[in-house]
Design a protein with these regions (language model features):
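Mature N-terminal segment immediately following signal peptide/propeptide cleavage
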Residues: 1-28, 34
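Acidic/His-rich structured neighborhood in mature extracellular/periplasmic domains
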Residues: 30, 34-120
C-alpha cells in the first residue's frame, strides 16, 4: 500500500494548484460512481492525461503500475495503445487516443491509514 500512496503523492507533487483542485473530490462524492468509457466524455472530472505534461502523465501511470501486477499493467497499457491506434484508424484522435483517460482522487491526501481512492 505504501508504494501506491507514494506514487500518488509523487503525481500530486507534479500538479499545479488548478490541477490539484480539479482532481480532488470528497470521499463520499457521487462522482466516485460516475464512471464511463464511451468515445466521448460523459463526466468531465479530474485531469485528462492527454492534456497534461508528459512528466505528470508518467507520474499518473506510475500510480497504475503500483496498483497492478506487471502483467495487468502491461495489459492496461496495451489497451490504451489500441485506443490510440483506433483513433488514428478512424481519424478521430480528439475523441479516441492513447491518453484519453481522466485521473481523479477521492478523499484527503493519499494515506495508509485514512480512506481514499482514485478513478482512472
Amino acid at each position: 500500500m505504501e508504494d501506491i500512496v507514494d506514487a500518488t503523492k509523487r503525481a500530486l507533487a507534479q500538479m499545479d494548484v488548478t490541477q490539484r483542485r480539479r482532481v480532488h473530490y470528497h470521499i463520499d462524492s457521487s462522482e466516485w460512481r460516475s464512471w464511463s468509457n464511451p468515445e466521448f466524455l460523459l463526466y468531465d472530472k479530474g485531469i485528462r492525461l492527454d492534456e497534461v505534461s508528459g512528466s505528470l502523465r508518467d507520474a499518473v501511470m506510475e500510480v497504475l503500475r503500483a496498483c497492478m501486477s506487471p502483467e495487468g499493467y502491461d495489459k492496461a497499457v496495451a489497451a490504451m495503445r489500441i485506443n490510440g491506434f483506433l483513433g488514428e484508424l478512424v481519424q478521430a484522435p480528439a475523441i479516441m487516443n492513447e491518453y484519453l483517460y481522466n485521473f481523479v482522487l477521492f478523499g484527503d491526501e493519499p494515506s495508509t491509514t485514512r480512506p481514499w481512492g482514485f478513478s482512472f
